[in-house]
Amino acid sequence: MNIHEYQGKAILRSYGVSVPNGKVAFTVEEAVEAAKELGTDVCVVKAQIHAGGRGKAGGVKVAKNLEEVRTYAENILGSTLVTHQTGPEGKEVKRLLIEEGCDIKKEYYVGLVLDRATSQVVLMASEEGGTEIEEVAEKTPEKIFKEYIDPAVGLQGFQARRIAFHINIPKELVGQAVKFMMGLYRVFIEKDCSIAEINPLVTTGDGKVMALDAKLNFDSNALYRHKDILELRDLDEEDPKEIEASKYDLNYIPLDGNIGCMVNGAGLAMATMDIIKHYHGDPANFLDVGGGATAEKVTEAFKIILSDKNVKGIFVNIFGGIMKCDVIAEGVVEATKQVGLELPLVVRLEGTNVELGKKILNESGLNIVAAESMADGAQKIVSLVG
């Protein structure tokens, strides 16, 4: 789960991590009032959306007086920002962060992520702050430094100091930088983050180390023990289809293609998308109905797939292990009748009760194309979609 920058900074502040003072605003008047309350010579007006690249898209402006705050707030609120992370449709700005300006001396990058290859949290840092870390990794990977953290003992002071020296934090500010990184690590672990990224971390003219931006993502599987984090969820920033899917424990991710996929199991779902691409088709989604799907869940899955107007055909690919093929077949038949499906539908069933499942499909009287294998199904749906 993602949250906004201002929410992430509030969490960091509660852990003693240094961030600039700021206030959230939902209207132009609130933005002006927030700037008055901050009482600083310079304010930064920042669009709050769940995407990076806001500055390049015109979503971050420096205001030197209240009139500029008003002008920028009027221009940004309600506008649609298009960045490399939003897709071509962009995201509408519905809230702003009004923040005190900083006398920036130098920008750095600091982030914590889980390295699945080593099963350890890794602290990454670079003195190339303010730019996309992926770009740094591609062009100058030698400028990224890493410390792998033993989960039994956590981040150690010497590791944080080593990182601070590697990225050339001024010696007199190393102590602050170490405290900053230790606090960030506590947030990452105690709040079950999947990413804790500060880009940029800055040193200021008055000798401070602070987070100028903050990106915190959380492991959705751990949200049951973080009710406070769950309350920060902004449904306006999420795809309505994903929200609807989550109500039925369906894992749905929209893509840009025109072939809807309904599969059980994440691995099979990825393999299904791969084989559709192999036969020159384009999947419209990743949709995993899970191991315990019912006819109701299958029906809802169909409705979610069909809510995407780009979908021109559907490929159902089920391997019945825990899941029984007859249950899926009943769900497919019921869903097809309920939604009045007119698009091409290819179904491949294999596993538990497969013959019974095929019988249900064959006797349904519906225009369902049967596939004998995953490759056969992919070829058929690609051909039908054209």
UniProtKB/Swiss-Prot annotation:
The keyword Ion transport belongs to this UniProt entry's keyword annotation: no
Q: Its Enzyme Commission number?
A: 6.2.1.5
| Cofactor requirements of the protein | Mg(2+)
Disulphide connectivity of cysteines: none
> SUPFAM superfamilies annotated for this entry?
Glutathione synthetase ATP-binding domain-like, Succinyl-CoA synthetase domains
Chain sites annotated for binding Mg(2+): 199, 213
One of the record's GO molecular function terms: ATP binding
**What's its catalytic activity?**
succinate + ATP + CoA = succinyl-CoA + ADP + phosphate; GTP + succinate + CoA = succinyl-CoA + GDP + phosphate
Keyword terms:
ATP-binding, Ligase, Magnesium, Metal-binding, Nucleotide-binding, Tricarboxylic acid cycle
Q: Does the keyword Transcription apply?
A: no
Q: In which pathway does it act?
A: Carbohydrate metabolism; tricarboxylic acid cycle; succinate from succinyl-CoA (ligase route): step 1/1
Listed under GO cellular component are: cytosol; succinate-CoA ligase complex
Q: Which GO terms describe its biological process?
A: succinyl-CoA metabolic process; tricarboxylic acid cycle
Residues bound to substrate are 264, 321-323
Q: Which residues bind ATP?
A: 46, 53-55, 99, 102, 107
* Cofactor note text: Binds 1 Mg(2+) ion per subunit.
What the protein does? Succinyl-CoA synthetase functions in the citric acid cycle (TCA), coupling the hydrolysis of succinyl-CoA to the synthesis of either ATP or GTP and thus represents the only step of substrate-level phosphorylation in the TCA. The beta subunit provides nucleotide specificity of the enzyme and binds the substrate succinate, while the binding sites for coenzyme A and phosphate are found in the alpha subunit.
**Per the similarity annotation, which family is this?**
Belongs to the succinate/malate CoA ligase beta subunit family.
Subunit details: Heterotetramer of two alpha and two beta subunits.
Provide the protein name: Succinate--CoA ligase [ADP-forming] subunit beta
Species of the source: Bacillus cytotoxicus (strain DSM 22905 / CIP 110041 / 391-98 / NVH 391-98)
| Organism placement in taxonomy | Bacteria, Bacillati, Bacillota, Bacilli, Bacillales
